[in-house]
């Protein structure tokens, strides 16, 4: 059974799990496996995903309880097209705010790199071009195989990593 689009125990979110998610996508040159561990103390409800380029084969897991992790994936569009997997997605949090997540796995590494970021928006906000641009052109993290952490505000913090390859893995933990 496919892992992407499912919820697992937060403690079991590992790179090995993300490797399995990548494997589910088959032989695609630009793809990403995303795992986000909810240790926020609250419940998240999926709003939507916005793909600037590329697509996904799975639905965002609808409800992510505390101590659970969501698994998601994206890939370049099928066929001989020069696109990457570039998207933002949003979860409404039980604290009344929105968790926004952005990733960019480009087609052309001569000009672009992997980038990612996480941000909390006040109130309920769906992912769209504006949310993507806000994070991509803000102060995103490079997908360089390094761990990063920051204070997200609202009593929450983030720790995460994204790999540098065209078959990318992104692992994030949101905690108090």
UniProtKB/Swiss-Prot annotation:
Binding site for phosphocholine: 53, 86, 104, 106, 132, 136-137
Subcellular localization: Secreted; Nematocyst; Target cell membrane
GO-annotated cellular components: extracellular region; nematocyst; other organism cell membrane; pore complex
Effect upon mutating residue 16 to Q: Shows larger hemolytic activity in human red blood cells, but no change in capacity to form pore
Motif (Cell attachment site): 142-144
Region annotation Plays an important role in the hemolytic activity: where it falls in the sequence: 2-11
Lineage: superkingdom: Eukaryota
Ranges for region N-terminal region: 10-29
GO BP terms, alphabetized: cytolysis in another organism; monoatomic cation transport; pore complex assembly
Molecular function per GO: channel activity; toxin activity
Site (Important in the initial contact with the lipid membrane): 111-112
Keywords (A to Z) from UniProt: Cytolysis, Ion transport, Membrane, Nematocyst, Secreted, Target cell membrane, Target membrane, Toxin, Transmembrane, Transport
Residues annotated as site: Interacts with the lipid membrane: 142
Region feature Trp-rich region, which is important for the binding to lipid membrane, mapped onto this chain: 104-119
Described purpose of this protein according to its UniProt entry: Pore-forming protein that forms cations-selective hydrophilic pores of around 1 nm and causes cardiac stimulation and cytolysis. Pore formation is a multi-step process that involves specific recognition of membrane sphingomyelin (but neither cholesterol nor phosphatidylcholine) using aromatic rich region and adjacent phosphocholine (POC) binding site, firm binding to the membrane (mainly driven by hydrophobic interactions) accompanied by the transfer of the N-terminal region to the lipid-water interface and finally pore formation after oligomerization of monomers.
Domain notes: Composed of a long N-terminal alpha-helix and a core region rich in beta-sheet structures. Before the pore formation, the alpha-helix binds the lipid membrane, partitions into the lipid-water interface and stabilizes the monomeric molecule on the membrane. Finally, it traverses the bilayer, thus forming the transmembrane pore.
The protein's assembly and partners: Octamer or nonamer in membranes. Monomer in the soluble state.
Family, as annotated: Belongs to the actinoporin family. Sea anemone subfamily.
Name of this protein: DELTA-stichotoxin-She4a
Protein's organism: Stichodactyla helianthus
